[in-house]
Amino acid sequence: LEGSPKLGGAAYLSALINEVREKEDTVFLFDSGDMFTGMLANLTEGEALMEMMMTMEYDALGIGNHEFDYGIEPFKRGIHRVSFPVLGANIFYKDTDQLFSRAYTILERDGVRLGVIGIIGLDARSVILPSYVEDLDFRDPIPYVRKGVEELKPLVDVIVVLTHQGKTGPMQTDAEHRPEVQRDFDEDIKLAGAVEGIDVIVSGHAHRGIEVPYIHPKTGTLIVQTYGYGTRLGYLKLFFDGEKITRHEGRLLKVWSDKLKPDPLVEKKISYYKDKVDHIIGE
């Protein structure tokens, strides 16, 4: 509606990220998948979004179902060209134990060492066009997260899991009493309870939005998730006493496009790809 506040946009999201970086000493930036969405992604087979992520200096991407919207090969090309790790601990080439991409990575900044694992859930796998991923196996993520945690624990201070799982569904529906159509993060709660040693789960796919970090009652794992579509920036600050997390602060920051000044570098990239797409459409 005219006059209503405006939310979202990559250049405005980047501006908000830069504001956080200016205020905080040590910042890591993650995405839990489905970056390959929207017209620019569709007409460039994800290239435009990968370029913008590099400009915004992401530290890691967990694989989502939309990363396979153009098949395996375009995504593989994207993985090889980006400067950040793309993670999928439970995606294998069919009938082998060869990973499609990296299972995890170790990031170090200002003396803080993070182990970051990425997984995609079987619900998310089910919405990928089968012919596009017929050469891949998507396996139960829990054993592979457990394996990653066991390998990373002696090497890092914090373990983060980027998840793309759970059910998506309309936020309001005539059948909203039915659990299968609700957006929720039950799969993340299940994972947090099944694997000891996960400090943070950065969740995607369901776009449920968790306004304040959920704390697992058994393991203490923090679970965070935005509403997706670049309308919020998830902010989580961890406080340490030695190597132990003692407390945290977390919330969703709204990306007000009528209040933020767009990041000129990202804006320039968007303009370049819009011109490129207009040329493609005009042919």
Q: Locations of the language-model features?
A:
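Active-site nucleophile-His-acid catalytic modules used for acyl/amide transfer and hydrolysis
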Residues: 266-283
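Acidic, metal/ion-coordinating pockets
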Residues: 1-265
